């Protein structure tokens, strides 16, 4: 059965082994990727989509991200930037959780899960500032949508609690996403980086902190993906 909103360009692309293989070696500009994703995002929200994120092919990524979040902020405050309908929050252990998304439709659905420790707000996640410093800021499959993803990540790094971390998940097998990860690793401290596999798909899950060494040059050799290790396989 076809899920609502699932028939988008990106969802069809990701189902193709050939297409994902080509994407891994094709230098597609990030602005072009962003324009396609924003169009598909609007369609998914309009048609009540995103239920495809509950499919088995996505479960390995969610398990990996939740595991990393709980390792660093199990008893802390988690800020989930680009939370959509709050799927990451489901099953996550935390002291406080705040999800932020710019889609009114998605946030309206997510708010059904609000309680004393959990809330969702509709806002632009790029420059959002919470009412208290978070112990972990999560950007899971969202930085491609941002007009300046590196600046957004650095912004959230400046507002972390002492010892806080940035947890980023992005699709691993495209040229623009790998370049974006290298740019982030050049400007922030890369604490750990894992590859999460599910069928023919793969995601990078990275933990970063604000750098105490200043800003390095763009895309330093050896910082990524040489520090990447495989985390999960769900073939």
Each language-model region and where it sits:
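Conserved class I S-adenosyl-L-methionine
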Residues: 6-71, 75-84, 174-176
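Class I SAM-dependent methyltransferase SAM/SAH-binding core
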Residues: 85-126
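A short acidic, Gly/Pro-enriched loop at the edge of an enzyme's catalytic core
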Residues: 129-137
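A short SAM/SAH-binding and catalytic strip from SAM-dependent methyltransferases
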Residues: 136-148
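A short glycine-rich, Lys/Arg-flanked "PGG" loop and its adjoining helix->strand segment in the class I
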Residues: 152-162
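Conserved beta-strand signature within the Rossmann-like core of class I S-adenosyl-L-methionine
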Residues: 164-170
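Core SAM-dependent methyltransferase catalytic element
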Residues: 196-235
């Amino acid at each position: 059965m076809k899920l609502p909103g699932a028939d988008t360009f990106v969802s069809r692309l990701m189902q193709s082994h050939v297409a994902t293989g080509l994407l891994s070696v094709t230098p597609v500009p990030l602005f072009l990727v962003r324009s396609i994703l924003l169009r598909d995002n609007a369609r998914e929200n309009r048609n009540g989509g995103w239920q495809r994120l509950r499919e088995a092919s996505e479960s390995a990524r969610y398990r990996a991200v939740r595991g990393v979040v709980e390792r660093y902020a199990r008893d802390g405050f988690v800020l989930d930037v680009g939370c959509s309908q709050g799927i990451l929050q489901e099953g996550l252990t935390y002291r406080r959780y705040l999800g932020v998304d710019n889609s009114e439709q998605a946030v309206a659905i997510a708010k059904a899960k609000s309680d004393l420790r959990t809330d969702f707000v509709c806002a632009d996640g790029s420059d959002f500032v919470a009412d208290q410093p978070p112990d972990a800021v999560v950007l899971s499959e969202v930085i491609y949508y941002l007009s300046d993803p590196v600046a957004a990540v650095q912004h959230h790094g400046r507002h972390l609690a002492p010892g806080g971390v940035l947890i980023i998940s992005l699709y691993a097998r495209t040229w623009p996403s790998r370049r974006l990860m290298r740019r982030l690793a050049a400007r922030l401290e890369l604490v750990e980086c894992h590859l999460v596999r599910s069928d023919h798909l793969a995601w990078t899950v990275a933990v970063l902190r604000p750098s105490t060494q200043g800003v390095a040059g763009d895309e330093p050799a050896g910082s990524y993906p040489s520090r990447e290790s495989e985390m999960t396989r769900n073939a």
